[in-house]
């Protein structure tokens, strides 16, 4: 599935007019005491920002997971057929931020009832998915999903699968921290894609966590 027009224009404009330099380092194995979480929620640009703002998150990288093609590129993934989804992989300190907090942040930044894409981005590449790295993460993810479903807060059942994590491939550098590098293009893309309008309709204007209590 090729990128939608709003996103294609944002990428082209950012590459054409340049971006402020932001140092990028490849993701490494977590240090002792740190853990990894991986979420697919449509456009990975939009999923980095909310996790970056959480105290206790060490890093958040855009990338690809869930497919069979080794070392996929953005062009390959966006064409479709690789099986990969756009994801954000987070390294965090569980002593400062529990996994359930990351789950809460994930839910309110996606449309959980749309399994065929997210917002204006359609196709398997943009599917929502929770990739778990441990059995404990699986238990918490399944419990969080069931709790949200049981709350009847959403118009339809939650359609987000919980899947074992596979190989993570870091996306190209121009995708990393796009919301900081190209603020105007990023905001234009979000608005044009209808992301914020849909999130407000689902969760409320100032939602920070789903109402599952």
Q: Model regions: which residues?
A:
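Flexible coil/turn and secondary-structure edge motifs
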Residues: 2-5, 12, 16, 20-213
